[in-house]
Amino acid sequence: MPLLDRNGWKAEAFDIVALEDLDAALAAKAPEQKLGVLVPNNIHPRALAPVQDRLDLIAVEFPRHSDGRGFSLGRMLRQQGFGGTLRASGHILPDQFGFALHDGFDEVEIDEAQAARQPVEQWLHARALISESYQRTEDGPATIFQRRRAAR
């Protein structure tokens, strides 16, 4: 499935396993192997805390574009200290791309049909449209309220 980050399309660089296969994959992991896990959007981030430092990627499933739990999970994983690549996988819309990046995701994975319908330029344009934030974000820009307070 196509992958997209803030710069455009990119190639897959990870071996990704299902959550139920994670223990076996970690036990068999080669030193140079980049290992990731695909998790549902309703998992509690603490369930990944014991192994997150051994993972290079966590891919969070987005089963429907109207289900925003994955955004919250991504933010909580970053707050918990996960420093690897964070991927939103599944039903993401271009309009949600900027929000995913603000919540700590590094990349999104969409299906081939969506990639054909919505070219990379549409995704990058949608990302650029979100220039202001009312809430603190994981990617650092000051919020509208922080800038207003600093200007006083």
Regions found by a protein language model. Name each.
Residues 31-37, 76-88:
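Short beta-strand/loop segments at the ligand-binding rim of alpha/beta enzyme cores
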Residues 46-50, 94-107:
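Catalytic cores of alpha/beta
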